[in-house]
Amino acid sequence: MVSNMRVLRVLRLTGWVGIFLVLSLQQTSCAGLPHNVDTHHILTFNPSPISADGVPLSEVPNSPTTELSTTVATKTAVPTTESTSSSEAHRNSSHKIPDIICDREEVFVFLNNTGRILCDLIVDPPSDDEWSNFALDVTFNPIEYHANEKNVEVARVAGLYGVPGSDYAYPRKSELISSIRRDPQGSFWTSPTPRGNKYFIWINKTMHTMGVEVRNVDYKDNGYFQVILRDRFNRPLVEKHIYMRVCQRPASVDVLAPPVLSGENYKASCIVRHFYPPGSVYVSWRRNGNIATPRKDRDGSFWWFESGRGATLVSTITLGNSGLESPPKVSCLVAWRQGDMISTSNATAVPTVYYHPRISLAFKDGYAICTIECVPSGITVRWLVHDEPQPNTTYDTVVTGLCRTIDRYRNLASRIPVQDNWAKTKYTCRLIGYPFDVDRFQNSEYYDATPSARGMPMIVTITAVLGLALFLGIGIIITALCFYLPGRN
């Protein structure tokens, strides 16, 4: 009886040890599995473009490790605390934060060209399907500019020009140009792209890249793209902004320097036509090769935008004129800059200087005679009677000689018959051909043909004759008396 009890105890002890050995071997086999059994590979994509009509593309093959992981988990008994911690750490390491890495944050595209954006998608979904149904949204936010040169200049100095949210650029309504969805089965879907073939969105499933092409870029395509990766609950996981800067070099640069009179200040305007964006042009001035600085109280600049042509800038400057020196060479230097691109151009003009003529008007022998000194060639005379232009009044204008004080200037004389209308008439001699106001150089006088004016000279003459006769008569009488009286005595 006692021996039987001892045998039972030995068997029981051996049985528990066997069970313990079996469990230990099973635990050891589970712990010896590789750590990557429960880890999905990075999404394997086949290179095919996303269609714009919403048709699903080729599916992503399911990872074969999923089935293996499920089988192992089924065969595994209740894990120990150590194995649970190891599995949890492994699962946490699989939760890599997704990211979008683009080749550039700013893309400069010239007008009518194609703009391209290329980004890498770093997406490594864990075994649970938290990110297995992700979404990729591409939104375009256009940027327009205020047509206010003061704002543009202040923003350019502050470095804020073109920054969304600033006072110098304001976005129009955002436009969702593509929304790409991945369902749990691995199929990709995309929403139709707006504006026809304007945008082309693609995903390379092998290289894990996505791209956006903007074809035939115009001014409305200036703005920034938002590329947002969302989870299955539509929560944003990562967001990137890529700016598309539409560029256009100035089409032409011209300097206009209007003619001036001697002693008056020179004025010049620099016109920079058809560039983009506003604020990308810098203007500087030169006078005979030396730097000239515009004055804020009388000089400035302004710009406007022409649809389909771009911006045009006009900058003005005022320069002193002593009247003793030759007209200066006024130059405008223009630098257009966008990113690392720089384009320069310049234009030069020399203003023409005119000198004040001397005009005198007199009446003689039934004519109004105008005498002009020191005028350039091409200047003629127009007569006005009571401020009414008279026809055919330039034929009787002749050159009387050369100006003695100004080279290549000459003297003129012109006349017109006075009207015998027994009235007081205004005659005006006006110089035509100067690039100034038409009444800038003229002289006016009145000719009095009234009866009182005509009779006055005759009365004066008769009075003078009678006075002279009376004076002579009195003289003769006095002389006669002088001779007569002494003889009588």
UniProtKB/Swiss-Prot annotation:
Regions crossing the membrane: 456-486
Cytoplasmic compartment spans: 487-489
Principal subcellular localisation of the protein: virion
Record topology, Virion surface segments: 33-455
Region (Disordered) location: 59-94
Signal peptide feature range: 1-32
Membrane topology: Single-pass membrane protein
Glycosylation sites: N92, N112, N204, N346, N392
Record bears the keyword Magnesium: no
Intracellular or extracellular location(s): Virion membrane
UniProtKB keywords: Glycoprotein, Host-virus interaction, Immunoglobulin domain, Membrane, Signal, Transmembrane, Transmembrane helix, Virion
Bias kind Low complexity: ranges: 70-81
GO cellular component, one term: membrane
Entry similarity comment: Belongs to the herpesviridae glycoprotein C family.
The name this protein goes by in its record: Envelope glycoprotein C homolog
